[in-house]
Amino acid sequence: MSYRIGFGIDFHRLQQGPKLFIGVVEIPHSKGAVGHSDADVLLHAICDAMLGALALGDIGVHFPNTDEKYKDIDSKLLLIEVYQLVKQKGYRVVNIDSSVCLEAPKIMPYAPMMRQSIAFLLEITEEDVSIKATTTEKMGFAGREEGLFAFANVLIQKLQ
């Protein structure tokens, strides 16, 4: 069987006002991520990783921020659409390993809900979804709580 790996990364600014969604889950915080969509940094990194594994470009190619139909869209819908491409190409998702970097809030209490939601959407088990959290030790834009970012690796397998 053939395997392919993809890597994704995404960044968003943080500011007062918007809600903060990470890995489908709304996380209570005084700041939220700013973006054309709901700015779910983790789902965007996973989308980029799946697209990369298929050599189909990136999230901006498929869902341009110049297209009003994606304005404030729920990133779950983007993830589902990218996953449909994975299936159309004859692959399945094997596993995901991801890291989210932000100074605050602490997100690991929400990781089980994130894993469950992502696993459900991608038809895999929670054990196949790894979510880790880290900080920049107060360095840079993330350390100043001006933004956050996420990395994701996705392994896909060609179905027979």
Where are these regions (language model features)?
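C-terminal edge-of-domain segments
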Residues: 142-160
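Short, glycine/charged-enriched secondary-structure capping and boundary segments
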Residues: 21-22, 114, 144-147
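RNase III-family endoribonuclease catalytic core
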Residues: 2-112
